[in-house]
């Protein structure tokens, strides 16, 4: 009787682990690869042209034109780093370095690089810079939610500023923004 209970318990534990891993991979947090849905490229993270999270080191690229989030090129961070995203919305956490370039037709394009934590975003919706390092972003959006301008994130633990769009900087560090205001709504 005890053996049957132990066997049933072991099966339940294995099923729980399997479902948790699948869910994490689908959400893009998992350590595995995976083309769409989860993290792109190797090692899980990867940047995307659209929105998404990248954890771990990796490389991924996504294109697309006319979307709300511009396509382009994104690269994950070094060790556990998030990485900046070119056109889309998203955030990067952890330490490492990530950079991305994206130009979206109909979306918000621009250039965003994140060092250490998140990094700034070019033309997308906001951007977080968390962790240690340096993040900067340059973006110009045609018809996007946020306009162009230049914003540089903070040093250690610093947030990030955005030139044209809406953004906030928290923690210690330095954030500055210069450039145009909001884009065309």
From Swiss-Prot:
InterPro entries in UniProt: GRP1/2 (IPR040417)
Name of the protein in its database record: Glycine-rich cell wall structural protein 2
Function: Responsible for plasticity of the cell wall.
UniProtKB keywords: Cell wall, Cell wall biogenesis/degradation, Repeat, Secreted, Signal
Any one biological process term the GO annotation gives: cell wall organization
Gene induction: By infection with rice yellow stunt virus.
Signal peptide: 1-27
Domain of life: Eukaryota
Compartments where located: Secreted, Cell wall
Species of origin: Oryza sativa subsp. indica (Rice)
Gene for this chain: GRP0.9
GO cellular component: extracellular region
Annotated stretches, region: Disordered: 149-185
């Amino acid at each position: 009787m005890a053996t049957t209970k132990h066997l049933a318990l072991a099966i339940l534990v294995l099923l729980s682990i399997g479902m948790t891993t699948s869910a994490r991979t689908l959400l893009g947090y998992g350590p595995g690869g995976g083309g769409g849905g989860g993290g792109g490229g190797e090692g899980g993270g990867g940047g995307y042209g659209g929105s998404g999270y990248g954890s771990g080191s990796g490389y991924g690229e996504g294109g697309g034109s006319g979307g709300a989030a511009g396509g382009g090129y994104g690269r994950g961070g070094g060790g556990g780093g998030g990485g900046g995203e070119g056109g889309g919305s998203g955030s990067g956490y952890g330490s490492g370095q990530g950079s991305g370039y994206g130009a979206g037709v109909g979306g918000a394009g621009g250039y965003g690089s994140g060092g250490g934590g998140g990094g700034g975003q070019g033309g997308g919706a906001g951007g977080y810079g968390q962790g240690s390092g340096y993040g900067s972003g340059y973006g110009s959006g045609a018809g996007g939610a946020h306009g162009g301008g230049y914003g540089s994130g903070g040093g250690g633990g610093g947030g990030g500023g955005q030139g044209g769009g809406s953004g906030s900087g928290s923690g210690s560090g330095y954030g500055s923004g210069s450039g145009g205001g909001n884009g065309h709504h």
